[in-house]
Amino acid sequence: MNKRSIIALSTFLFVVLVTLFLVSKLQTRELNSRDYIQSRTPTLFFHGYGSSANAEKHMVEAARQAGVTQTIITATVDSHAQVTFKGDIPKDAINPIVMVEFEDNRNANYAQDGEYAAAVVRKLQAKYAFKKMNFVSHSMGNMSILFYLLEHAQNEEFPKLQKQVNIANHVNGLEGMDLPANLTILDNHTGQPSAMSNSYQKLLGLREIYPQDQVDVLNIYGDFKNQSDGSVLNVSSRSLKYLVIDNAKSYQEKRVTGPLAQHSQLHENPEVDRLLIDFLWGK
């Protein structure tokens, strides 16, 4: 093959690749309106203990790749509850995502974690004046948003929570730590557990103040082995139901199995990605 032929072939292949790329981008834009709602409501992602916004990247990128949104920012909150944004949300942004990062990420004072979450919501509200929002949380991030709700669920100045995705939540204790002995679910209809950890008892107030007929709740837990994700018993995760079922607009549980059902792998799990994408943004 002579030099001219090589150049011609290279040019042809380049044009083909560019065309395929543009077609792919157009298909992604089509998905935005065909398969997913077109909303200005932001979705906030909260990571777990000792973690960072990196733990949220797989889920967020899955949403972006699916064509849900092209607007992703990071909100970092320090130990003084001061919030810094990286990126901006345009006025016409569709389904914007906020990746929340706690610098004080090993603080097991859940009430304080809840105030860190409140600081992010407050700053987001002040800058963008959103009326509604969604939450996605993993592991201790669940405690952050639940204790946030315990203090601020009825705060009329904050955006109203619309959808809540809880992943690998340990609302009624962690194995080897604060898990009540012989924990079971006494009543599958109400979700009432047989025993309650100290933190769970503090959250019982949610049964009274959780927003009435406002929030759709998706509770995802992993059955990696022996009805546990390796760190949290399924019965602890499922204890969430008792706190919200009487007031939630809807409540559903999803059990995930397989190697990626392990506690720290759930936020890297394509099945979890699909569950939360369909729940939050599916038409």
Language-model segments: residues:
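Lipid deacylating catalytic domains
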Residues: R4-F12, V16-V136, M140-K283
